[in-house]
Amino acid sequence: PSPPGFSPFR
């Protein structure tokens, strides 16, 4: 999964 703090849709 995506790392913490990462937003694919900022």
Swiss-Prot record:
MF-aspect GO terms: toxin activity
Subcellular location: Secreted
Keywords annotated in UniProt: Amidation, G-protein coupled receptor impairing toxin, Secreted, Toxin
Protein name: Nephilakinin-3
Family that this chain belongs to: Belongs to the bradykinin-related peptide family.
Domain of life: Eukaryota
Primary site of residence: secreted
Residue numbers bearing the Arginine amide modification: 10
One cellular-component annotation, GO: extracellular region
Its biological purpose: Causes constriction on isolated rat ileum preparations and relaxation on rat duodenum muscle preparations at amounts higher than bradykinin. Is a partial agonist bradykinin receptor B2 (BDKRB2). Has insecticidal properties. May be related to the predation of insects by the spider webs.
Other facts noted in the record for this chain: Has been extracted from the spider web. Negative results: does not target bradykinin receptor B1 (BDKRB1).
